C-alpha cells in the first residue's frame, strides 16, 4: 500500500476534492446529493485530465472532503468540549492524526477552534503522522496555500514516518484521530479445519512467471497466534468465526462431499499492533476512530476485503484476492 516505488497511496491514489463545500440545506434528498457529487467528480477528473490524462487513475473520497467543513467542525466540538472538561488548563490540547489525506480535517479543526475559542487555539498543537512522502508534501502544500497558513503554521507538525516505526515516548495527554484508517491496515488470512477446528495461516508464493499462488500452513506466525489467543481471552460474548457452532460442524462432517476447510477469516493483526503502539508510546491517549461497518462487493470470507481497481473512471471489482497492479486490499 505504501511502498515508495509502486505502493497504492504513494504512486496511484488521488484524493477527490469537491471544490466549494456543498450547500446541504438546499439539497432535497440523497439522490440529488449523489447527482451533484457525480457532477463534481466529472469536473474534478476533467481538470486532472487536462494536464495528466490517466485511464487508470485511482480516485477516492473521504467524509472529510464530502462534508467539509461540518465533519471537521463536529470533531473539533468534541475535542474542545472534552479538553475543557478534563484537561484544561493544566495541559495543552495535543491532537495526533494518522492518515490525514489532503490535510483537510486538520485545517477544518484548526479553523473552528480559532474562530470559536481563541484561548484554546493558542494552546492547540496538531501533529500529523503520515507514512506517505507524497501525501506529507501535499499536506504541507495545502497548509501553506491556505488563507490561514500564517496563523496555523505555528500549531502544526507533519511527521513523515510510519506509526509502526514510532519510538518517541509521549507522556502528555493527547487525542489520537484515526478516521478510515483501520480498513487499510493489513490483515492475515486464516482458515479452519472443520474436523479438528485447528487454524491455518495463509501465505503467497510467486512463481518464475510472476504468478501468485496461495497456500496455507498449520504453523501460525507469532503475531497471528497472539491475536487468536488475545481474542479468545478478551471476548465478553461469542464472536463469529467461519467454523460455526459445534452442532452444525458435527452435522456437516457427516454429509458427503463437504469441503475440509472453511472459507478464510481475515483477522486484524496490524490493528492489534497499532494498539500496542498506543499503549507503549501514548499512555495518556484518547482514541477517536471511525471506519466502515460493512463493505459491498467483498470477496468470499469473514471480514473479507474489497479488491478493486479503477479504469476509465469506472470501479472494477475483482472476485479474488491475489490481484496485483492497482488493486486495493
Each language-model region and where it sits:
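Class I S-adenosyl-L-methionine
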Residues: 171-329
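Rossmann-like AdoMet
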Residues: 1-96, 102-173, 190
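Beta-hairpin (beta-strand-turn-beta-strand) motif
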Residues: 100-101, 181
Amino acid at each position: 500500500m505504501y511502498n515508495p516505488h509502486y505502493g497504492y497511496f504513494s504512486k496511484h491514489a488521488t484524493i477527490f476534492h469537491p471544490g466549494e463545500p456543498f450547500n446541504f440545506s438546499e439539497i432535497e434528498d440523497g439522490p440529488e446529493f449523489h447527482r451533484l457529487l457525480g457532477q463534481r467528480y466529472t469536473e474534478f477528473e476533467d481538470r486532472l485530465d487536462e494536464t495528466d490524462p490517466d485511464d487508470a487513475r485511482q480516485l477516492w473520497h473521504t467524509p472529510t472532503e464530502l462534508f467539509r467543513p461540518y465533519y471537521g467542525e463536529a470533531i473539533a466540538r468534541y475535542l474542545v468540549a472534552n479538553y475543557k472538561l478534563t484537561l484544561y488548563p493544566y495541559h495543552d490540547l495535543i491532537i495526533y492524526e494518522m492518515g490525514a489525506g489532503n490535510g483537510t480535517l486538520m485545517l477544518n479543526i484548526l479553523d473552528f477552534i480559532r474562530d470559536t475559542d481563541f484561548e484554546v487555539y493558542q494552546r492547540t498543537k496538531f501533529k500529523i503522522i503520515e507514512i506517505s512522502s507524497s501525501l506529507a508534501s501535499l499536506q504541507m502544500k495545502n497548509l501553506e496555500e491556505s488563507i490561514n497558513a500564517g496563523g496555523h503554521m505555528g500549531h502544526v507538525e507533519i511527521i513523515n514516518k510510519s506509526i509502526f516505526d514510532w519510538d518517541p515516548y509521549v507522556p502528555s495527554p493527547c487525542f489520537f484521530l484515526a478516521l478510515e484508517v483501520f480498513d487499510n491496515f493489513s490483515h492475515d488470512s486464516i482458515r479452519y479445519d472443520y474436523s479438528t477446528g485447528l487454524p491455518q495461516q495463509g501465505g503467497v508464493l510467486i512463481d518464475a512467471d510472476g504468478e501468485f499462488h496461495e497456500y496455507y500452513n498449520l504453523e501460525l506466525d507469532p503475531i497471528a497466534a497472539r491475536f487468536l489467543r488475545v481474542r479468545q481471552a478478551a471476548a465478553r460474548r461469542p464472536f463469529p468465526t467461519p467454523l460455526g457452532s459445534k452442532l452444525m460442524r458435527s452435522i456437516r462432517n457427516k454429509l458427503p462431499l463437504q469441503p475440509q476447510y472453511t472459507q478464510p477469516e481475515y483477522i486484524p493483526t496490524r490493528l492489534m499492533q497499532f494498539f500496542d503502539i498506543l499503549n507503549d508510546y501514548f499512555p495518556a491517549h484518547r482514541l477517536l476512530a471511525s471506519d466502515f461497518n460493512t463493505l459491498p462487493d467483498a470477496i468470499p470470507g469473514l471480514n473479507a476485503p474489497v479488491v478493486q481497481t479503477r479504469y476509465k473512471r469506472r470501479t472494477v471489482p475483482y472476485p479474488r484476492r491475489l490481484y496485483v497492479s492497482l488493486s486495493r486490499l
